[in-house]
Curated annotation (Swiss-Prot):
It is found in: Cytoplasm. GO terms for molecular function: preQ1 synthase activity. This is NADPH-dependent 7-cyano-7-deazaguanine reductase. Its EC number is 1.7.1.13. It comes from Helicobacter pylori (strain Shi470).
Amino acid sequence: MTPELKSLGAKTPYIFEYNSQLLEAFPNPNPNLDPLITLECKEFTSLCPITSQPDFGIIYIRYIPKDKMVESKSLKLYLFSYRNHGSFHESCINTILLDLVQLLEPKYLEVYGDFASRGGIAIKPFVNYAIKEYQEFKEKRLLNAK
């Protein structure tokens, strides 16, 4: 099917240090369609870069693929790689977006983080990206972000 995929169907070595090289993609079987794909990671963890305390959140990734789609096991391993990574919530979300845009070159992509509150404040960063033809869609999504 797609022999170049390394993670799917293989024994899983879990890496808990940020590593964008874990992400893999496969050819979009229907590049003429524009599905809005939602991926949800309910167990995202990273470390506060100041206190080294763990942060927990749900990461929502939505995208309209162009020629490539993200392989879900590689995405899981990539998101797990944040486990011992010290970074602010906003930085995690921005980096996830940039890594996925570099890998997929999608028509549209957004990342939203719903982080558990610490000190009584919940941080919920949102960032999105679009190619020229999807800029209007991007603006509408930004205005309607949670």
